[in-house]
Amino acid sequence: MDDGNENNENAQHDEYDEEEIEIPIDEIIIEEVDDDHLLEGEGEFQIITQPSNNNNNSNNNNFGDIYVSNPNTPRNNNNNNNNNNNNNNNNNNNNNNNSNNSFNNNKKNEVSIGISENTNENNNKNNNNNNNNNDDYNDGADERVKTEEEIKKEAENELNQSVPFLSLFRFADNTDKVLMFLGTIAAVINGAAMPTVSLVFGLVVDAFKPTQFNDDPNYDIYDTVRSISFYLLMLGGGVFVLSYLETTLWMIAGERQTSRIRREYLESTLRQEIGWFDTNKANELSSRINSDTVLFEEAIGEKVGRFIHFFSTFVAGFVIGFTKGWQLTLVITSVSPLLAIGGFFTAKMMTQMTKLGQEAYSRAGGVAEENIGSIRTVATFSGEKLAIDKYSNNLKDARTVGYKRSFFNGLGLGFVQFVILGTYALAFWYGSTLISNKVTNSVSDRPWTGGDVVSVFFAVIIGATSIGQASPCLALFAQGRGAAYKIFQVIDRQSKANPFSTRGIKPETLSGEIEFKDVGFHYPSRPDVPIFNGFNLKIKPGQTVGLVGDSGGGKSTIISLLERFYDPCQGEILLDGEDIRKFNVRGLRQKIGLVNQEPVLFATTISENIRYGKEGATQDEIEEAAKLANAHSFISQLPQGYNTLVGEKGVQMSGGQRQRIAIARAVIKNPNILLLDESTSALDAESTKLVQEALDVLMKGRTTIVIAHNLSTIRNADVIIYIKKGVAVERGTHDELMAKQGLYFDLVEKQSHQQMYNLLENGTRSRRSSTFSAEVNPLLDSFHVSKRSLRKNESESNKKDKEDSNNKKKKKSNKKKVEEVPMSRVVKYNRPELGLWCFGFLSAVGTGAVYPGFAMVFTEMLTIFQNPDPNYLTDHANFVALMFVALAVGAGISNFFQGFLFSVIGEKLTYRLRRDCFAAIMRQDVGWFDLPENSTGKLTSHLATDAALVQGMTSQRLGIVLQNILTMVGGLVIAFYSGWQLTLVIIACFPLVVITSKVQMQILAGFSSKDGCGPAGQVASEAISGIRTVASFTTEKQVVELYKKQQKGPSSEGIKKAHISGFAFGFTQLILFCVYCLSFWYGGKLVGSGVFGATDKEISDNCTPQTIPYLWKDYDTCERAQNTIYGFNSMTRVFFAIVMSAIGVGQASSFAPDLAKAKAAAVSVFKLLDTPSKIDPTTEDGDRIDIVGGDIEFKNLHFSYPTRPDNSVFRGFTLTLQSGTTTALVGDSGGGKSTCLSLLQRFYNPVVGEIFIDGHNIKNLNVRHLRHLFGLVGQEPTLFSGTIADNIRYGKHDATQEEIEEASKLSNSHSFIIDLPNGYNTELGEKYTQLSGGQKQRIAIARAIIRNPKILLLDESTSALDADSTKLVQEALENVMKGRTTIVIAHNLLTIQNADCIAYVRAGQIIERGTHDELLEAEGPYSQLWYNQQQK
């Protein structure tokens, strides 16, 4: 098969040819072959003929109707034609030789027997169609495999690339654009309002200019200041409206776009071809829709409006500065390149670090979803610690990246603050020089005044400070751009089989003619392992075709190709004469009905699960389909009937019930083509017979492909085809194949004799014996029984199904008051970072002291400007400039350490919370996961978002809040010291600010606490994890619509939150402007009335005979001037101290939405952490049994599932198993057999009764120790992403490679594993779809065997295996079972007839028990079940 793949690659891509090796002549290789691979009449050797370079047909040596060939070489090898068509050169021989070289490297080359009726025809196929036609289809075909260097280069490019900021808004609709436009206008005007205060303040400064008393002795300061205060009040009203609009409009626009992007991402994910999911983990994809989109929303919501606001402030400040005094402004802006360089570097590094961090978090989310979704397997094999460690390792990667991001974040903040305050030093020094030298202001055409300098300086202060305030927004934008990169990659990817596309043929009906022509195929995740190479198959309309053969031979791949889950790498598949790639994908799949071996149900009602097969189906149609699938009886007996919730992945239903619902889902589709992949494997005998009858009716007139290991289900097929290693080696009717006595004949013989305990006695195969017909006649010929008796049995079987089915959950309306988690508890969780806390707190103190210090220094500078003495101005201005330099250095250092340390604290908290939350989930009992609120989607959503949001209480945001609190306190201390009267009046307004902020936080917390994203996240998670079922039943649009419906609740709450947040923020800003207004008005009054003024000493020191004639008109004027100067100093010190306090309050309140989210998330997180486990598998408590014998006793058990307390599963169940014996449980589907195993493993506790092992009550045993006693092989094996070796080692965590291989040999999996290119290191990938059902089951058996368990639990452990594998695995299990207590659940009674005890379970009670012979003699239910099976 490898040869064929290489030939195809060479034919299609000559430019990628590998080194070519010539073999000049034909070679005859004689190779020894194992006995198992010999066919009848063969000796110990096989003849393999390799083709010469010039003979394309030498692969096949025809001997009449039978040819002998190597299945690993292509039957059609016409690559010379391919190469001539693709490239006019003479590389034909080289291509063939390259294939032959690969051929020689094969470990074994087996002889296959096949029908040669189309051999010559196949050899003459014109393969250039395969290369030329594919481009004509609307969806692509195969892609070249990338080299390692290309992959590395692509990874480097991904790291360096980032989504342009504006592209974040690519999904905005017209409404969003209008909202953003209006929000931008509001933000621009609102941002420009604050620098306007600088003009007002310049007027205030000039209003207090003392030299005015020389010109006008009657000048009244109070009247001037009162007029200025009125302007501020008007400005405050405008700011209130603008702040409301800015915040509300951007929040609404962000909420709308995020909802849309989530839908687009989900739709884009669902439209991808199935092969894409083989290389992209579904759990990471679904995790991204919860975690990455949160960062995306942060980057496009109100933070954008806030950034525009700050940027507008920056621009307006500098515009005012240039207008009032371009010389001074130009000096200040000369340092702006430093800010630009620092900002660019910081943003670039933050973007890269964010992307790496999100990738690590996505991997962690994938681990969480995989393990939570497979919690029963995790619990069985005590894999909780492995899961936690794997999850933690990914979190550690994200944490390490977070540390680096924290460093660059702190560095950026510190650098910006240093440059800004350093610029102030330069500005004041230069401004004082302009005043002292009496330089003419070219704008006002008069000498520079203190008011001019203050207006320019204050405008630039506000503008420059806004850059620092915008820095957190830039960090969020960087995170959003990094998160959007992966999201947009999925959205922009063109699917090769797009179910949403309207292109292609949309057939009204199909006759069902199917033809595979020279098909070559390999799975995208395993390009080196060809499945088909030149595969040919033709099916006539209305035919029923049975596919049989070894596991892994390619049977299920045929179905996948027909469904267009994958496209062939070469060749074509024709449907009614048209290549299926020309059909519309959705239209094609709507005409095909599929029932898989492992049915996938969704966490909704039974009715909705069946309706997935036909959109808009009526209830009558649903019930009719259920009747045909033998599901109506058990459904109608459930308390909620068709409205019963099946639970996540159908966990509330038994295996047989799930399968019957899945069959009903296919039946209601009324397809033209029916694909049945082991569709009755999970059913008991009665159900199998009845469902098979229903399927027989359904198959009439339809083309049907049936994959079956149970040959009785395909005995009447029109054609039966034996598939071996991707080649159809035998075909014909049942009678024709039996007459030929070939591989199919062997398979029938093996299956007819298959028993568990006589396999050891019959170690050698009985081939073509003379007594064969007599032995298999009951299996092959007695296919019809009385329908009336079977209907009666069905009624009895289904009568009690309701005990193992789901009851609709009672919905509780919880209108609880929003809980709160004490801040101290969150901080306590960061206790290990006490040292970082101390340094971070000191840094916040330093940063918080900067602004009060600035108020003091700035006030001194204003006082200097008011003094008309130029010598005084020059001397003191230099000192004040040096004080600004000191402030700049301190601010740079404190901001760096504050930003860095608090971010590190936040990263550590996020890591610890996520790890502990996941550990808390892993320690819960299995019954806890049955609850709707604990579904996989909801839990992974909480893990992805809540822990990260809690960081808002302790990380950088908390640092900023602490900083601003200290700023406020420092400012108030200065204000009270400078003028308590004015301070008290202003402080009287503060309760309004505090109350507004508190109300905002409480209301936002109320909205945030509502679990709005959970249901939508659950829909997405289930759809992506069950993508094959979604694709097969073309329910992609339904899923998207359901997701959209689930989004309505969170979206409406988000809009409410936007209005409240906008109003609260606007009202807070209004209060601040009122404070400014009151400060100037009342301050002017205090100065004018003399309350604020100079002391007698200050007057006497400044009003001397030397200064009066030089500066003042007279002594009275000098006295008034000194009172004005010192009064102005007190007033401005109070004012700027209050301004700094107000800035602290304003910035703290701006983080109210984040803090509210953090507090709500903390409630969710700590509620999970505090949830006790009824059955904790991680605790060390409990007894341990030193020497385990294996005696088991179930004593008077009564049990009902936690989600269905009214439906009793067990009613006095009692059973005793002696050590070393085998006990088989048989009976109706849903009767409680699997529940027995669940209770034994303590997935649940019985309501009444006890279970004993060797006399020990299992409730008293350590849970982990208890589960280590068992080896479980379930009906539907669950494997994990990772290598095959990792999955087998999951049974014994410290297993060596030798132990792994030994377990694989015992489970008959070693041979197919070593045939894979990477052997035991083969990555299974997401959902391990590249393995057949039998291969998965054998790996699962190896996983159980490697534990060397004391007690073996087998739940239909061989139901998915073919006859050959079943025999070998049964032999392996027989060896393992020796000396062990074994419980076997089986529908096939042949596998348990030699059990020491057989118990018939019905409705949660054992109605009869005994050996096989004893139960047959009793002629009870077991006897009837046995004879029913023998008559099939």
Curated annotation (Swiss-Prot):
Ranges of Low complexity composition bias in the record: 52-62, 76-106, 118-135
Molecular functions (GO terms): ABC-type transporter activity; ATP binding; ATP hydrolysis activity; ATPase-coupled transmembrane transporter activity
Organism: Dictyostelium discoideum
SMART domains: AAA (SM00382)
Gene3D superfamilies registered for this protein in UniProt: ABC transporter type 1, transmembrane domain, P-loop containing nucleotide triphosphate hydrolases
Keyword Membrane set for record: yes
Domain ABC transporter: 514-750, 1192-1428
GO BP terms: cAMP transport; sorocarp development; transmembrane transport
Membrane topology, from the record: Multi-pass membrane protein
InterPro entries in alphabetical order: AAA+_ATPase (IPR003593), ABC1_TM_dom (IPR011527), ABC1_TM_sf (IPR036640), ABC_transporter-like_ATP-bd (IPR003439), ABC_transporter-like_CS (IPR017871), P-loop_NTPase (IPR027417), Type_1_exporter (IPR039421)
ABC transmembrane type-1 domain segment(s): 180-479, 837-1157
Name under which the protein is recorded: ABC transporter B family member 3
Name of the gene this protein is made from: abcB3
Annotated segments matching region Disordered: 1-21, 48-149, 787-819
Biased composition (Basic and acidic residues): 791-807
Subcellular location: Membrane
Any matching Pfam family: ABC_tran
